[in-house]
């Protein structure tokens, strides 16, 4: 689609490195300007009925400029999120993807794994702990597959760390090592 010369564009995607890199690769052919951003707000719900006028208030918004992004463009996009009530952080797109792999993408994958590993016969007995743990797994699987695959490297690292800790918990349980188990559960 055509963009008026000088138009400032941002996005709200869950991964940043590939989006910012794609813009930069074609930047000379485009008339607009781009600054990546990711508001950490929303839910697994979709559609107009899921709208929330306070969605960004008190939430974090991450702005992810490239090295070629003019400072005034970064400030304008940061100002947009700030005006909506968000706390704004500015960081490198790759750093964003690394941090969000640990705090968003891996938790989603783990929630889906917990939901998938729960025997159907156990579901009538699933209480708030199970529901809290698996709530985010109700998100759009097609969308989440794209997010997880787009951030595969950092996500693999985050999931490997989780697998290591899970293995330590399993080892402590199998050994009956209560002290070690308590230590692991406190982290």
Question: Residue ranges of each PLM-predicted region?
Answer:
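Rossmann-like NAD(P)(H) cofactor-binding subdomain of soluble oxidoreductases
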Residues: 2-49
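Alpha-helix N-cap/loop-to-helix initiation residues
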Residues: 16, 44, 69-70, 155
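Conserved strand-to-helix beginnings and helix N-cap segments that scaffold or border functional pockets
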Residues: 20, 46, 71-75, 159
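Short, glycine- and charge-enriched coil/turn segments that flank and shape catalytic ligand pockets
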Residues: 26-31, 68-72, 121, 174-180
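Short, flexible, solvent-exposed loop/turn segments with mixed acidic/basic and small polar residues
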Residues: 50-55, 145-146
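Internal alpha-helical scaffold of NAD(P)-dependent oxidoreductase catalytic cores
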Residues: 53-138
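Interdomain hinge/lid region at the active-site interface
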Residues: 121-187
